[in-house]
């Protein structure tokens, strides 16, 4: 009998630790109603991001409040920016939104919060979703989602909000990708694939580039790898090596997800929006490491307009399939001793 009880306790503990994101997803998915997964992901992920920056802000705000007698000003934006924390104006703070979650105007209040954050933080300009007031979004459900996200526990110092919420953000990305089927692959590469590429390349230091970065999974995993191997990375045990992140994403809504995904992890990166073939936003970049999962067998990539491009050192790629163009773009952006790891469709390296 005691053994059974112990097993039950162990099972509960495991469920609480391992299944936390899954339980949260089940509850959030139940609130989706008839909304399409592709649309719903921006509603939920935008709110998770808002919760993250508000949590980080409130933690710093409390510390400044405690030091007010020494001259600290909790309402000075520079006090936050000096610590790489986003300034959150009063109308965007989570406590304010949570208190108004049951009001019919909650959609407009969230939109106003997003506008205020972008206004006061230029790095987020054009990144945050601002369509929570639209009529098709049920405001009762929106309030329930806010209540649900409010219950995400930050815990002790080892699992601060950016770690817990980062895990939740990534898990939700994977679930939305699964719900969207083949289309979901445009913004999410399975974690096991990303982890394999990163562990093969070991990007401890230097420039890391992803020319089709989706929601920035390659970069998140690269930084996690560095942190996990901090003691043996030849960098004095620092969790972040001398690593610079560069990426590009052609889909605007996916680019926004990428920017939020990096910000929620506290990662700086130069992530550009634009068509990598026709508007290479990092034309002079020579990277030490390139990780990528390009879209497979794209036929309408406009190759006929790039016949004389300097990137085609090993021959002009076929206009009807972009696979070989991706390979040459990657090789073009590598330093002579650089290393690349990328995923291609079956038969890409043996096709004519």
What does each model-found stretch correspond to?
Residues 182, 314-316:
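Extracellular loop and loop/strand-boundary signature of outer-membrane beta-barrel proteins
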Residues 183-292, 297-301, 306-310, 344-347:
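Conserved S-adenosyl-L-methionine
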Residues 30, 42-52, 250-255, 318-352:
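Conserved Class I SAM-dependent methyltransferase catalytic core
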Residues 1-204, 270-281:
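Non-catalytic, mostly N-terminal accessory regions of nucleic-acid modification and defense proteins
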Residues 19-22, 26, 44, 48, ...:
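Generic recognition of stable, solvent-exposed alpha-helical segments in well-folded globular domains
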Residues 51-64, 176, 226, 230, ...:
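A generic secondary-structure signal for well-formed alpha-helical elements
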């Amino acid at each position: 009998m005691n053994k059974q009880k112990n097993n039950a306790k162990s099972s509960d503990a495991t469920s609480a630790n391992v299944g936390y994101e899954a339980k949260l997803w089940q509850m959030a998915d139940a609130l989706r109603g008839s909304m399409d997964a592709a649309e719903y992901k921006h509603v939920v992920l935008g709110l998770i991001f808002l919760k993250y920056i508000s949590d980080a802000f409130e933690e710093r705000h409390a510390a400044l409040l405690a030091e007010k007698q020494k001259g600290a000003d909790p309402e000075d934006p520079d006090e936050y920016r000096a610590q790489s924390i986003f300034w959150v104006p009063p109308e965007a703070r989570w406590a304010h939104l949570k208190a108004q979650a049951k009001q019919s105007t909650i959609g407009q209040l969230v939109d106003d919060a997003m506008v205020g954050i972008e206004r006061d933080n230029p790095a987020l300009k054009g990144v945050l979703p601002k369509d929570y007031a639209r009529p098709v979004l049920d405001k009762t459900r929106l309030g329930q989602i806010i209540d649900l996200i409010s219950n995400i526990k930050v815990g002790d110092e080892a699992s601060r909000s950016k770690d817990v919420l980062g895990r939740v953000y990534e898990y939700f990305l994977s679930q939305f990708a699964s719900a969207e089927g083949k289309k979901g692959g445009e913004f999410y590469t399975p974690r096991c694939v990303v982890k394999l590429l990163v562990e093969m390349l070991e990007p401890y230091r230097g420039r890391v580039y992803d020319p089709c970065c989706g929601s920035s999974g390659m970069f998140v995993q690269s930084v996690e790898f560095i942190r996990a191997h901090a003691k043996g990375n030849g960098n004095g045990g620092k969790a972040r090596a001398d690593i610079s992140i560069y990426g590009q994403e052609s889909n605007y809504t996916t680019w926004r997800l990428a920017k939020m995904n990096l910000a929620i992890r506290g990662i700086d990166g130069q992530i550009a929006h634009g068509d990598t073939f026709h508007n290479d936003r990092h034309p002079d970049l020579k990277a030490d490491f390139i990780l990528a999962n390009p879209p497979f067998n794209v036929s309408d990539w406009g190759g006929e307009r790039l016949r004389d491009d300097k990137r085609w050192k090993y021959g002009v790629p076929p206009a009807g399939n972009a696979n070989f163009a991706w390979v040459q773009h990657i090789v073009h952006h590598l330093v002579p001793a650089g290393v690349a790891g990328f995923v291609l469709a079956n038969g890409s390296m043996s096709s004519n």
